[in-house]
């Protein structure tokens, strides 16, 4: 079962998050029909976005957008404080041979010439936006760079996805380790050593380690678990939302749809759900609109 934990370690000097996201990423793969390299890029982004979302409170939410100039195009993910994520890639059917390390070549798919941006909606008039250059294209390093440079928190982000031969997801998950102000050098050195030796996160998930056990493996001590929450792929789109969008087009455009196709199909970018509007429904919407 997928879930996320929030924890503290080293007497509160270290804040940590870890998640198993295999089912969540599998749902993203199923909905978008991503090929393996695209699945890894989408899954890593979803997992990192989930953990960033877990740092929010209440009804706050955020959007992550990665545009690295690679063949995959843009990756966009929405996450909230409730463990819900939805995401898509511009070009889901991207796959390359494994890289020199024998891993899915995410860097080649994402590209290294572009930006990673995070827009937070904290319920205020203004959105908070942070943007950094892509430094690696492998995504874990890029989210690390975002946290360090845009949010000024010394951090380490690990995200990983393993894909089955039939394109379904074998394992997915991630962790974020953050140092609180005033962390002593001894603690920093110990954590850096652990991070340099730890197995890839996807391998730890595949072995069956829980998020709690992953943090213990990464931190070198048993963390204090503050909160556990279920996580899932969730898109709040609905036919009503698309009705509102169609109404916004105005009478003439709706009439054009009726005359040209006799119906309309709306597709949600984020979850690929399709909504069909019949001729009668379109006529009803046309008659409702004042534009």
From Swiss-Prot:
Keywords: Chaperone, Cytoplasm, Disulfide bond, Redox-active center, Zinc. It holds the Pfam family HSP33. Under oxidizing conditions two disulfide bonds are formed involving the reactive cysteines. Under reducing conditions zinc is bound to the reactive cysteines and the protein is inactive. SUPFAM superfamilies: Hsp33 domain (SSF64397), HSP33 redox switch-like (SSF118352). GO terms for cellular component: cytoplasm. Disulfide bonds join 235-237, 268-271. It is found in: Cytoplasm. The keyword Transmembrane helix does not apply. GO terms for biological process: protein refolding. GO terms for molecular function: protein folding chaperone; unfolded protein binding. PANTHER family: 33 KDA CHAPERONIN. Belongs to the HSP33 family. Redox regulated molecular chaperone. Protects both thermally unfolding and oxidatively damaged proteins from irreversible aggregation. Plays an important role in the bacterial defense system toward oxidative stress. This is 33 kDa chaperonin. It comes from Bacillus subtilis (strain 168).
């Amino acid at each position: 079962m997928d879930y996320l934990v929030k924890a503290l370690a080293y007497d509160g000097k270290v804040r940590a998050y870890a998640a198993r996201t295999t089912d969540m990423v599998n749902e993203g793969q199923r909905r978008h029909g991503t090929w393996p390299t695209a699945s890894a890029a989408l899954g890593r982004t979803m997992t990192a976005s989930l953990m960033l979302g877990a740092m929010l409170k209440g009804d706050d939410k955020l959007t992550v957008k990665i545009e690295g100039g690679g063949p995959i195009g843009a990756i966009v993910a929405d996450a909230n404080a409730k463990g819900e994520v939805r995401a898509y890639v511009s070009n889901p059917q991207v796959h390359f041979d494994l890289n020199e390390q024998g891993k899915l070549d995410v860097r080649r798919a994402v590209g290294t010439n572009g930006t990673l941006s995070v827009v937070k909606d904290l319920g205020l008039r203004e959105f908070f936006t942070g943007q950094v250059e892509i430094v690696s294209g492998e995504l874990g390093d890029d989210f690390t760079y975002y946290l360090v440079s845009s949010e000024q928190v010394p951090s380490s982000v690990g995200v990983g996805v393993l894909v089955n031969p039939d394109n379904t997801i074998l394992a997915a998950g991630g962790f974020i380790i953050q140092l609180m102000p005033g962390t002593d050098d001894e603690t920093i050195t110990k954590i850096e050593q652990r991070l340099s030796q730890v197995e890839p996160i996807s391998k730890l998930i595949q072995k069956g380690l829980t998020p709690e056990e992953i943090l213990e493996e990464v931190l070198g001590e048993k963390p204090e678990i503050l909160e556990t929450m279920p996580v899932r792929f969730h898109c709040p789109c609905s036919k009503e939302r698309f009705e509102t969008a169609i109404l916004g087009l105005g009478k003439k455009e709706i009439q054009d749809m009726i005359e040209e196709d006799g119906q309309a199909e709306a597709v949600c970018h984020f979850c690929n759900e399709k909504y069909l509007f019949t001729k009668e429904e379109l006529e009803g919407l046309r008659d409702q609109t004042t534009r």
